[in-house]
């Protein structure tokens, strides 16, 4: 009987050892598979980030080549074409370059630290064309300018410090469009309405008349109607303007308009680059603001998500 019991214990021990060994082997295999997937995932993520950076450098090279060969930027140039999905190993990459100087630069309304009345008036006209209250313009000017005296309809520190969650005015140029929600009477819906027509650029810029939408043209050219601006944009689609003089000549058909030619250009320096890369299950979206200086664009701002 004792011998039988010993045999039974031995069998149980063998079964236990086999079970442990089997479980351990399964665990090791699972861990190896998990480790392999993690390594592959990390590699894929690293590769997508690399492709995102490569996309920005591609855009810089394209814009540098364009700047070296032409002093006029318009929608018929090759760089405006969206990069189609290019296959890469186990994935793809897509990219696009957009002009940023056809939009109204919100930072233009303050120059050398002081509110610029002509630019504030232009922004007010744009607001009215978009069905938004014009007093948003002086409110933004007060947010950006360096003084503490509020404009009519605007607000300085006294207004913001009285809020439930007080803060002060920035007294500096905007750094991003989303900052507008901190300005008196702006909200997310107003920002969304403005987004297709405005930019936030670090320097004072001119409007590229070859890219400006009708609303922006009607805002920066006093007494120009939106209907006439749309007619001009239709003409531009067929034949881009070669220089500012070409543009002002085209304005003559609409009467005695007097644009401020120093505010206009046909050459852009700021561009927005968007890229999307996918490798395996990893995806990354890259955005960058480029400034073309002496033909070779520098990166002003970049985001990788």
What are these language model-derived features?
Residues 2-305:
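Compositionally biased linear targeting/interaction segments
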């Amino acid at each position: 009987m004792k011998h039988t019991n010993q045999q039974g214990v031995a069998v149980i021990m063998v079964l236990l050892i086999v079970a442990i060994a089997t479980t351990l082997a399964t665990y090791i295999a699972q861990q190896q598979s998990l480790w392999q997937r993690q390594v592959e995932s990390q590699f894929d993520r690293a590769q997508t980030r690399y492709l995102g950076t490569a996309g920005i450098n591609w855009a810089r090279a394209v814009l540098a080549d364009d700047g070296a060969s032409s002093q006029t930027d318009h929608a018929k140039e090759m760089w405006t074409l969206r990069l189609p999905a290019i296959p890469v190993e186990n994935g793809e990459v897509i990219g696009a370059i957009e002009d940023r100087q056809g939009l109204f630069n919100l930072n233009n309304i303050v120059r050398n630290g002081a509110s610029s009345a002509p630019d504030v008036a232009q922004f007010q006209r744009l607001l009215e064309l978009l069905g938004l209250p014009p007093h948003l313009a002086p409110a933004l000017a007060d947010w950006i300018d360096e003084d503490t005296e509020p404009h009519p309809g605007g607000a300085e520190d006294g207004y913001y410090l009285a809020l439930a969650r007080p803060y002060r005015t920035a007294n500096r140029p905007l750094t991003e469009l989303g900052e507008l929600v901190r300005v008196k009477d702006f909200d997310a819906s107003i920002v969304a309405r403005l987004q297709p027509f405005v930019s936030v650029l670090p320097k004072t810029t001119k409007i590229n008349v070859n890219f400006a939408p009708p609303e922006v043209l009607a805002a920066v050219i006093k007494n120009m109607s939106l209907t006439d601006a749309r007619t001009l944009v239709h003409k531009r689609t067929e034949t881009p303007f070669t220089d500012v003089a070409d543009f002002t000549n085209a304005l003559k058909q609409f009467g005695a308009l007097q644009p401020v030619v120093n505010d206009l250009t046909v050459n852009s320096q700021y561009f927005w680059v968007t890229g999307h890369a996918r490798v395996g299950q990893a995806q990354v979206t890259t955005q960058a603001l480029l400034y073309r200086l002496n033909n070779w664009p520098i990166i002003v701002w970049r985001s990788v998500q």
